[in-house]
Amino acid sequence: MSTAEQRLRLMQLASSNLPIGGYSWSQGLEWAVEAGWVPDVAAFERWQRRQMTEGFFTVDLPLFARLYRACEQGDIAAAQRWTAYLLACRETRELREEERNRGAAFARLLSDWQPDCPPAWRTLCQQSQLAGMAWLGVRWRIALPEMALSLGYSWIESAVMAGVKLVPFGQQAAQQLILRLCDHYAAEMPRALAAPDGDIGSATPLAAIASARHETQYSRLFRS
């Protein structure tokens, strides 16, 4: 696959139109807004930076790197182990449901794009979008850092668009936020991908509480 084709595939994977339900979940933000923890755009940026620094950089990216290497080596046992570890790091039922739902949706795309994906790997990909992205990145010969950029941009944009609806703030503020969050992501991503096993784990107790409380929140825009 040529470099141009690979870049276009990355754009497709990062697109908000990818039908995996990324905009259906708020990851606890909806309850945090109702509770008064995130009252304005400045508070939202602080909240999201904390989720990135203490969650995405310490769980998602290190585990994505391990899943990618397992796919490179064809080591499904390792991929299964790290996928189970990822689900264990999702601290609420809501977060685990999101992971599985996004994985199932991505696996349906995978069946269309790569119908020759082995059944055992397809079953694994149904459990987590990260597993599916890792397998597809290896199959399409897209390097790990490039896949991680696509994954991160999609996560940032989904979070900011949730903030637009919930906090709320306008589209211009949203674009400024995306720029700043992307700069932070690009600066810290290499270190997160290289994190040792002992550093894996989240430190976002307020986000876990917000997600748990969102499961029974009376009025909701986002899924639980």
From Swiss-Prot:
Gene: ureF
Quaternary state and interactors: UreD, UreF and UreG form a complex that acts as a GTP-hydrolysis-dependent molecular chaperone, activating the urease apoprotein by helping to assemble the nickel containing metallocenter of UreC. The UreE protein probably delivers the nickel.
InterPro entries hit by this protein: UreF, UreF_sf
KW Transmembrane (keyword) present: no
Pfam families to which the protein is assigned, alphabetical: UreF (PF01730)
Signal peptide (residue range): none
Keyword terms: Chaperone, Cytoplasm, Nickel insertion
Subcellular location: Cytoplasm
Organism expressing this protein natively: Klebsiella pneumoniae (strain 342)
Family assignment from sequence similarity: Belongs to the UreF family.
GO terms for cellular component: cytoplasm
Primary localization: cytoplasm
GO molecular function: nickel cation binding
Function: Required for maturation of urease via the functional incorporation of the urease nickel metallocenter.
Protein name: Urease accessory protein UreF
